[in-house]
């Protein structure tokens, strides 16, 4: 829908201040040229070398052969494949083929790069290298990158903002750290709350989610709380994350059954540099 190859049944699509549904055919074609796209499958032409694959969209646009090859070699340098210009796709690894696809998508100097599940077919090590490349492209070339993924780790690694979609509708929008710290929608909570056998948790118990960020992620907040408040708690789940280069951690605690002890624990957490809230629905998320 962002490229308007698929027209939405309702609503509008606005890209760079232009409402695509109101553009003429010629204007829409020009708008699409400002968008590059990579997919889960690399879709390289098998009978063309890496260099020739990158030149292909430039040839279609009427760019001279010399200028197209010059641009393609510049892009091969950017994606770290300057020594693979004459290799065919069958001679490249999956990660290298995706790098060629990225270079091809950048050939026309787009303002926006759309990444549709671009790392889903790659192993974890290659995924990290591709994400690092995309992050560098965003930083050095100033291109807006829109990532479509079901992997929260990808969002945490390279994105500044996130829109969570549930049943074809946007359930929540915000910066990645805002959504991680204070998820509001049920879908966001499913994605962000620590994994675990939630069904094994007793219903009717009180649970608290604590989020640590920055330096506070390294402080012994829970142990200090137990000592200070004399309120023992059970740590049900915990994990840590790196979101856009910043350390975050979260815990799900089972609060004491004694009401006064539970209130002391929550009051103490409010005085610390952490976000804490009761999550009565945690066991059922």
Annotate the PLM regions.
Residues 3:
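Helix-to-loop junction immediately C-terminal to a conserved catalytic motif
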Residues 18-19, 55, 59-83:
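Conserved ABC ATPase "signature" region
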Residues 20-36, 65-69, 179-183:
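ABC ATPase NBD coupling module
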Residues 48-56:
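Short coil-to-helix segment of the ABC ATPase nucleotide-binding domain corresponding to the Q-loop/switch region
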Residues 87-90, 108, 115:
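Conserved signature/switch motifs of ABC ATPase nucleotide-binding domains
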Residues 88-92, 96-98:
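Conserved ABC ATPase signature
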């Amino acid at each position: 829908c962002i490229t308007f190859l698929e027209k939405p049944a309702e609503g509008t699509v606005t890209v760079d201040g232009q409402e695509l549904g109101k553009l003429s055919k010629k204007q829409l074609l020009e708008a699409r040229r400002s968008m590059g796209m990579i997919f889960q499958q690399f879709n390289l032409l098998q009978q063309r070398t890496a260099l020739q694959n990158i030149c292909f969209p430039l040839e279609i646009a009427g760019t001279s052969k010399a200028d197209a090859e010059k641009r393609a070699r510049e892009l091969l340098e950017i994606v770290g494949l300057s020594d693979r210009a004459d290799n065919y796709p069958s001679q490249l690894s999956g990660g290298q083929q995706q790098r060629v696809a990225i270079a091809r998508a950048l050939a026309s100097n787009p303002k926006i790069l759309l990444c549709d599940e671009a790392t889903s077919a790659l192993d974890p090590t290659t995924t990290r290298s591709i994400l690092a490349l995309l992050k560098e492209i965003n930083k050095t070339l100033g291109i807006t990158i829109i990532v479509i993924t079901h992997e929260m780790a990808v969002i945490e690694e390279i994105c500044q903002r996130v829109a969570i979609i549930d049943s074809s509708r946007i359930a929540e929008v915000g910066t990645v750290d805002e959504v991680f710290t204070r998820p509001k929608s049920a879908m966001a909570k499913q994605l962000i709350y620590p994994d675990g056998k939630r069904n094994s948790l007793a219903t009717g118990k009180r649970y608290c989610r604590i989020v640590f960020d920055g330096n506070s992620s390294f402080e012994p907040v829970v142990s200090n709380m137990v000592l200070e408040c004399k309120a023992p708690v059970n740590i049900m789940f915990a994990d840590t994350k790196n979101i856009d280069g910043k350390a975050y951690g979260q815990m799900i605690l089972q609060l004491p059954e004694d009401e006064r002890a539970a209130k002391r624990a929550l009051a103490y957490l409010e005085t610390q540099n952490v976000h804490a809230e009761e999550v009565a629905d945690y066991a059922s998320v």
